[in-house]
Amino acid sequence: MLRHAFIMSVHTNMEQLQVLVTALHFGDVYIHVDKKQEALYQNLKEIYKNNPNVFMVSDRVSVNWSGFSQVQATLKLLELVESTKRKYDYIHFISGQDLPLMSHAQMDAYIESKGVGNQFVEVNDIDSYKWRLTQYSFFRENPNNRKKLYRLTDIALRLIQMPFIRRQNFKGFELYKGSSWFSITYDCMKYIL
């Protein structure tokens, strides 16, 4: 049987998360709770304090949707995995709102059919998206960025900057886009860190 670690960044729905953690009994679970959700963090810490297979990130990040803070939270999870010195065949980044559709045996069989050691990462070219990389997004890390006024202001600022300001910091890089979710090997995680 393959050894699995499941990492997740969560912000809500403690009951759903408890169902998920129970369903993942065959692996270790690493949880990052959004820094804005102190009550959830304290509750989960208390619930899992005696569970040797559940680990919680203590140095948490205030996560804003589609902001770099999502990457920071993911890196903190990977650093926590590495710090335990537990070796896994695969590390899976999932949502706290997920539920597994496969058993441990089915998951192992699927991975083995694709080749143990392969990474499962969605990657797409960005040809239809490149124009957006030249624009600055002003409110990505603002916790209010989903409010209508901020969205309208962001759109207005983008339109104003279009003819005058072009972001240049990606020149020389071949960029791709994809999902946040992945399943990677331990060696791949070490390479990332």
Describe each model-derived feature in a short phrase.
Residues M1-L193:
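ER/Golgi luminal nucleotide-sugar-dependent glycosyltransferases, focusing on the catalytic module
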